[in-house]
Regions:
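Sequence signature of WD/YWTD-type beta-propeller architectures
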Residues: 1-409
Length: 409
């Protein structure tokens, strides 16, 4: 176990894709806590030398955070808050965007168009937690809608979207907050403010993960027959070509003044888990986690309680079937998780220690000892691309610092 950062400030890792492709640098932001969005820089640290470099500094009163890295290039994408924020336009779920940086040059990922007629391929609100597909060709994100938020915040439902490399998108610029973007952006999930109890309808789509390069899994909040929220696992197949991404279904890709943007034609989510009758229904929201497929794209991992109420890791075949309980721990898994690049193991926090779980047998190997002064954060446990290291956050002398251990794999 090795401490990587030492500066007297906080360091925040995203929950996946936090390493450069050469496995030498960890990227981070400098939010004072994961819940606030007041960091000014995106930075990286060399895990061998401790050298720190600034990748991007936010201009004009803006803030930045939640950075991830392209799988094969030194290309970074992160959340960017509004420049020159004022009383009418401040950072919020529906007021933020993706920005990509490569070789020191920054560009907008998503375009914004909030005036009618809305522009297909542009968003009408904020994108968040941008993650490259395994081949680096596309970027997934979660989304909130400014237009519907202005009409009624109850209509502004969290959804999942994808940025595909078929831009640029140039809105009309009829509002001073509108901007162009490099990628064609659409939603791929479908929500309703009033899901029918006991149905497959959802009012929130979130915490998505790539399944190969052409599918996304995500958590969708269903309602039980008694009206209780039950988070279930969903999957959606993505279009195969540019025409597919740009072909509208029965409702407009860009949405209307009263409806959310719609997925392209034929892009329809499918429910994979049916847990309403379990003793502890649904995927857990605590710890917050993102559903994650193995590198082979065959199994999707998620967290759910067992019959004793303990949070365990479960696997679901991407094609469907019954979920399989992988871990049988005595205590809750305490964090988000990632897969080893071989697919042979999954890393997370258990018993306040960094744990490796065999992805076939569920056997646990601990990489760290219990250390009350440096308890790992629940936010992120991330393998390096070469599989030899694993990184996390833990406090040291009052600040959240970055730590690393060898995996032995």
């Amino acid at each position: 176990m090795k401490q990587i950062t030492f500066a007297p400030r906080h360091h925040q890792l995203t929950n996946i894709n936090t390493w450069t492709p050469d496995s030498r640098w960890l990227v981070f932001d400098v939010r004072p806590s994961g819940a606030s969005f007041t960091g000014k820089t995106i930075e990286r640290v060399n895990v061998e030398t401790g050298e720190v470099e600034t990748i991007y500094t936010a201009p004009q009163g803006a803030h930045v955070g939640v950075v991830t890295v392209h799988p094969s290039e030194e290309k970074y994408v992160f959340i960017h808050g509004p420049r020159d924020p004022d009383e009418s336009w401040q950072y919020d779920f529906h007021h933020r965007q993706g920005v990509m940086v490569q070789n020191g040059r920054a560009s907008n990922l998503d375009a914004l168009d909030i005036t009618e007629p809305y522009t297909p391929g542009a968003l009408r609100g904020g994108s968040h937690v941008h993650v490259f597909s395994p081949d680096g060709n596309k970027v997934s994100f979660t989304y909130n809608d400014h237009v519907l938020h202005e009409r009624d915040p109850r209509l502004d439902l969290r959804n999942v979207g994808v940025a595909a490399p078929f831009g640029p998108i140039m809105p009309g610029g009829n509002h001073p907050r509108e901007y162009a973007g490099s990628h064609w952006c659409v939603l791929v999930s479908c929500t309703t403010p009033t899901p029918a109890p006991g149905s497959d309808e959802i009012n929130r789509a979130y915490e998505e993960g790539w399944v190969g390069n052409n599918r996304l899994a995500f958590i969708g909040d269903t309602l039980s027959l008694s009206g209780e929220k039950v988070p279930e696992l969903f999957i959606v197949d993505l279009p195969a070509d540019e025409q597919g991404w740009k072909r509208a279904g029965e409702t407009p890709l860009a949405g209307t003044s009263t409806t959310m943007p719609s997925p392209p034609m034929g892009v329809e989510q499918r429910r994979l888990t049916f847990t309403h009758q379990r003793r502890y229904p649904g995927l857990v929201n605590v710890p917050r986690h993102w559903v994650r497929s193995n590198p082979q794209g065959s199994d999707i991992a998620f967290l759910m309680r067992d019959e004793a109420g303990v949070v365990q890791l479960w696997l679901m075949a991407a094609e469907g079937g019954e979920p399989r309980q992988l871990t049988h721990n005595a205590t809750d898994i305490q964090s988000a998780f990632t897969w080893h690049p071989s697919g042979a193991a999954i890393g997370f926090v258990l018993e306040s220690r960094i744990a490796l779980c065999d992805s076939v047998t569920g056997t646990i190997v601990f990489l760290t000892d219990s250390d009350p002064a440096h308890q790992p954060s629940a936010d992120a446990v991330v393998f390096s691309p070469n599989g030899k290291r694993i990184a996390w956050m833990a406090p040291a002398a009052g600040f959240r610092q970055l730590w690393m251990a060898d995996t032995g794999l």
